[in-house]
Amino acid sequence: LASNSSSYPSSAFASSVKNPARLLNTHFLMPPDIIPVELMSCGQTDAAIIPLLAERFPGYGLTPYVVRRESMGFIFNRIWAAIKRETLAVVAEGVATPQEVDAIYHQATSGIPVGPCRLMDAVGLDVVLAIEEHYAHERAGLPEAPRTLLRQLVAEGRLGAKSGRGLYDDYGPA
């Protein structure tokens, strides 16, 4: 039994399953054409399960990364959270437009095809907001401005690509 959540570790619901030795997180990144998958134990996961998945996932075109200890956000999303929050702060403060943020990000990262604003639009700003609210609840001291901007966009129905408008307005009708 595997959870895809990177915000909620499977240890949070291990007591609710019959056999927690079969429980773990397998976090597939978004959008779905990104191939890393993070594997994290619930703390009671059978010691053979994660190595087995790490061995088999490459056969499906996936690159497994084992999270060595429980961590809300796992590996990538902890790094991504900082990029995302600072991106939203830059836009919220009027320092740069989403297009300018993505353009400089693209150039500075040797051509990563999608900047942080497009990626947040692809994930869905409502989803990004829910994750950010959860992180803020779990980690004191995170800046408020990024969540304020997200709340405003979501209230306006600007959810990203799925609604036709988000940080970008060029998606066409949803």
Where in the sequence are the language-model features?
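A broad, low-specificity signal for short, low-complexity segments enriched in glycine/proline
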Residues: 1-4, 130
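Residue-level signal for cytosolic alpha-helical hairpin/rod architecture
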Residues: 84-85, 132
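Mid-domain beta-loop-alpha active-site segment that forms a flexible
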Residues: 75, 83, 123-127
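Rossmann-fold dinucleotide-binding core
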Residues: 3-69, 73, 77
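N-terminal alpha-helical segment
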Residues: 33, 83-84
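NAD(P)-dependent Rossmann-like dehydrogenase/reductase catalytic/cofactor-binding core
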Residues: 48-51, 58-70, 92-93, 98-174
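Short glycine/serine- and small hydrophobic-enriched flexible loop segments
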Residues: 85-92
